[in-house]
Amino acid sequence: MELQFRQPHFSDALLLLLLSNLLLWEKASSIPACMAEKSGCWNPRMETFDSAIRKAETLRTVSKQFYVELYHNQFSSGKFATLTSKLVRRDEIVFRAASHCHSTLTNPPNKGIQYITIEIPEYLKTLINYVGAWISPLFHLVIELSAMKDVPETILSKAKEIEENNRQILRDLRWIITEVYPTSKKKEIFPSWELLSFLKSSSRNSKFLAMFNLSHCLEYDTQFFLFHLRILKCRITGKDC
């Protein structure tokens, strides 16, 4: 008995094509977003996180150097020695300058396991405000230091590098939240720095009190910038956990 083979109908071929395309689409949708590169797959989210983390590492290092420089450079060492002496004697104004950081008003998850329990969108918004809290103080620090005739280049250059890296980290965080949560409301609330008027004062004592506060808080905050960026990268991308 001769077997009869049915010629494929045009509609059957079209159905097969549609099914094939559907399977390809489902497979593609399960792969993390990336862009074709000669060396492989480029993931813009990963690249932006890595970029922000590198800047945060630089920011941390330069902030520590800036802190040490202000204590040892002839430009500021005398003023900082006087402020340290007052701090030991629990002078109220100096004690607050050394212990109160305006950035804490953003309520960063720096205690316990808050960084694990906080929702990711809220975590991103909080970190944006935490980093953003330094935009104005650092901008004015560079302006005021640039206007001081006796400021050493080593101090001024570090201030500029700190300001630039902080600004770029904020830019990266804004890109990430827009990319990951495009419909999320992105209300930014940057707390004001209470010692800004001291920094802009004509009194050198007031200026150095403001720098005393700024250097202490930066030395503290920058380690948490780096910590939170690494945690967020893990929680959002699942990499480097």
Curated annotation (Swiss-Prot):
Q: Which PANTHER family match?
A: PROLACTIN-8A6-RELATED, SOMATOTROPIN,PROLACTIN
Is Disulfide bond among the key words of this record?
Answer: yes
Q: Which GO terms describe its cellular component?
A: extracellular region
User: Sorted alphabetically, which keywords does the UniProt record give?
Assistant: Disulfide bond, Glycoprotein, Hormone, Secreted, Signal
List the glycosylation sites: N213
Question: Any idea which GO molecular function terms this record carries?
Answer: hormone activity
Q: Which residues form the signal peptide?
A: 1-30
Query: According to the UniProt record, which cysteines are disulfide-bonded?
Result: C34-C41, C101-C217, C234-C241
Instruction: Describe tissue expression.
Output: Expressed specifically in the placenta. Predominantly expressed in spongiotrophoblast cells.
Checking Pfam families in the record gives: Hormone_1
Is the Secreted keyword given for this protein? yes
Q: What is this protein called?
A: Prolactin-8A8
Could you say which protein family the record assigns here? Answer: Belongs to the somatotropin/prolactin family.
The listed locations are:
Secreted
